[in-house]
UniProtKB/Swiss-Prot annotation:
This is Na(+)/H(+) antiporter NhaA. The gene is nhaA. It catalyses: Na(+)(in) + 2 H(+)(out) = Na(+)(out) + 2 H(+)(in). Belongs to the NhaA Na(+)/H(+) (TC 2.A.33) antiporter family. It is a multi-pass membrane protein. Coiled coil: none annotated.
Amino acid sequence: MERAIRNFLSQESAGGILLMVSVVLAMILANSPLSGMYHGFLETEMQVRVGNLDIDKTLIHWINDGLMAIFFMLIGLEVKRELLEGALSSRAQASLPTFAAIGGMVFPAAVYLIFNYSDPITQVGWAIPAATDIAFALGIMALLGSRVPVALKVFLLALAIIDDLGVVVIIALFYSTDLSTISLIIAAAAILGLIGLNRKGVTSLAPYGVVGLILWIAVLKSGVHATLAGVIIAFCIPLRAKDGSSPSESLEHSLHPWSTFIILPIFAFANAGVDLSGMSLSSLLSPVPLGIALGLLVGKPLGIMLFSYIAVKLKLAVLPEGMGWRHITPVAVMCGIGFTMSMFISSLAFVGEGQMYGDYARLGILLGSIASATIGYFWLSKVLPEKGAKA
């Protein structure tokens, strides 16, 4: 188990660094003479037609609806494994990160709404600062190397996974519109098919892939966000086969490098290109970017720490062995790194009439995430023992 966690962390950490490069490259292109080419490329129309089925979307929508469905399937596989056999499989292990994650979603949303309560158009962005980018957070933590105890990394990992699960629920409940009854019926039939495969003990991944593709298309056409199909597919794939092997973990290991080194960097490159040419200090201090930035930088750690403290004081949870509040606090600050997850929610929240707020939202995400990463890194570096020293 410990070796699996270390492998996961090392891969996610490298991915976090690659994500940073993707964000910087997107920002450079979006604010250079090549900005027209950059945005034009992302708006390229791509059509898939099979018989009467016709899916016509821009490249950026294929990335957000298609590639990110694979990423969310990976999240689903991780959540299922952790719930059944991992860091969330017992109440004692799951309690603290669960309370922390709840606080870390409630408080950022509240901070955002404080700044945007009077505007119904911008109110829909309340969930943007509620997300944590696990790859970025682990990438920043990895810069401290072996000084970071595994227990602290596992706490961050568990918290971020629960946070991701919360984001999935938020997307399903609040960012699905114009529902198609026929597509929902087809999606329900596909889900029943996946459950049937699981119940019959089918361990081959091919049938899940075929039915899963049908589910993704149905969900895409239904008005519910297509990424949720990935989570449903993941939950239906068996964790253990009769011979002791794990189809779920096998798929998880196969998807990790694709997600870490291809899907998330592409998503970041496509969504992080904020045009700063028309921005000013007043733009930065407008309700949307200010609410998001402070939600990530202030609301996130405040919610995590307050809910964690209350849970420990009420004996509903315990701190990880060898860890104190001085260790948990900078990790809570690091959880304010929203980046790709926050940008994803932003792409769902600000559409149609609110599309003009997209760049403002991304600016707030970048500022809040960078500040959280910087402060969290130096704070954690200060409280951890020097390499070779004892804690």
